[in-house]
Regions:
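Generic C-terminal helix-cap and adjacent flexible tail
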Residues: 192, 235-241
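Two-component histidine phosphotransfer core
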Residues: 8-56, 60-218, 230
Length: 241
């Protein structure tokens, strides 16, 4: 009888020890997970800041303001419209810093159009931007479409003497919403993206797209062959949010 009591006591102590160990492991896991998520949020914030800074570099601000000043002498109404685009463009960049999730595609598209209007004011007929976006009812991280379009304009078509065309289109498959930005600019070697450099904005978009909504981005480009960038945003992510 005494032996049975001892065995029961030992079993009880072992069971309790297992519970304590399991509880400690759960606590450790939760702590590690919280720290990981905190680091992820900080990394995403730094990426958003990096993208925003790359978009509003001093030379870009100077060029836009100089163009608006010149426009004031010719067409005050057009100058007012350009100033509105510029203000909304800056506001969109700043608002993105406080947004850790996704925003409606139409909101990102409108932000992109403000940028496009500013560049068309500067480059005129040398820059053509076409929109083919029948699919719009989905969300994506802020500052994803606009940096891709900016890369196409700044490092693609406007590097050609005759300018060029950028095409923005949307579609969908059974599993993804698809956003494509194509240009007939000078193109680049894909290794330039891996190495960073002037295409670092594309790398940042790819990282944030994967981290925020589980999406992915594909890039096809070659010297003098233009560039095609495709973003895929999973539908299952949208349904689970």
């Amino acid at each position: 009888m005494a032996a049975a009591v001892v065995v029961d006591t030992v079993i009880g102590e072992i069971t309790l020890a297992h519970v304590v160990v399991a509880f400690c492991l759960i606590q450790i896991y939760i702590t590690v997970q919280i720290e990981y998520e905190k680091q992820q949020e900080e990394q995403l914030l730094q990426q958003r800041i990096s993208i925003m800074i790359s978009q509003i570099q001093p030379h870009f601000l100077y060029n836009v303001l100089t163009s608006i000043r010149a426009l004031c002498r010719i067409d005050a109404r057009e100058a007012e419209s350009a100033l509105t685009d510029f203000t909304l463009y800056l506001r969109g960049n700043l608002d993105s810093l406080s947004n850790t999730g996704c925003i409606p595609f139409l909101q990102e598209l409108q932000h992109t159009k403000h940028y496009v209007d500013l560049e068309k004011m500067r480059f005129g007929r040398d820059l053509t931007v076409l929109f083919n976006t029948p699919v719009t009812q989905f969300s994506l991280p802020p500052l994803t479409l606009e940096p891709i379009v900016e890369n196409a304009v700044r490092h693609g078509v406007m590097q050609r003497l005759q300018g060029g065309t950028v095409i923005i289109s949307t579609s969908e498959t059974e599993s993804d919403f698809v956003v494509t930005v194509s240009d007939d600019g000078i193109g680049f070697d894909a290794e330039q993206l891996a190495a960073g450099g002037k295409h670092i904005g594309l790398w940042n978009v790819r990282e944030r797209l994967a981290a925020v909504c589980g999406g992915h981005m594909e890039i096809e480009s070659g010297i003098d062959k233009g560039t095609n960038v495709t973003m895929c945003i999973p539908k299952c992510r949208k349904e689970s949010e």
